[in-house]
Amino acid sequence: MLKIVEETKKSHAKLSALWRLISIETTRPNGEVIHDWGQNPTGLIIYDSSGRMAVQFMRDPPPTSASNPLTIEEKNAAFEGYYAYFGTYEFNEKDGTVTHHIQSSMRPYEVGTDYKRFYKLGGNRLTLSTPPMLREGEQRVYRLVWERAQ
């Protein structure tokens, strides 16, 4: 049991950091790469050494508003242009995956679900990729590139 705990701590240490979002790319079945979240989305993902995580990011350009309170259209634009959840994670070095166990999300249907992501670590960069996901009638792969914050 102690060996498992030590191995878990070592694997968590590899991801444990604050990471800044560099890019989000979506690959369509025909190989076309699109930027659903814009050319320069902003965001953070945090992994801690105890196995907790949180992620949030925002579209580029971000939605703007001149009203307070927001109109229904402005609320919809703000919701569609932002994404966030938190929970715990498992890092599986052997499989090359990290699984996010979602405890709370701005999208209620995600609570209690698990998201498995393929990862690549290189230097100060972390790349997380989804398995193919059905979106807009086609299977798409999402790739998020993060840079370790200094």
Which functions belong to the PLM regions below?
Residues M1-Q150:
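Lipid interaction determinants
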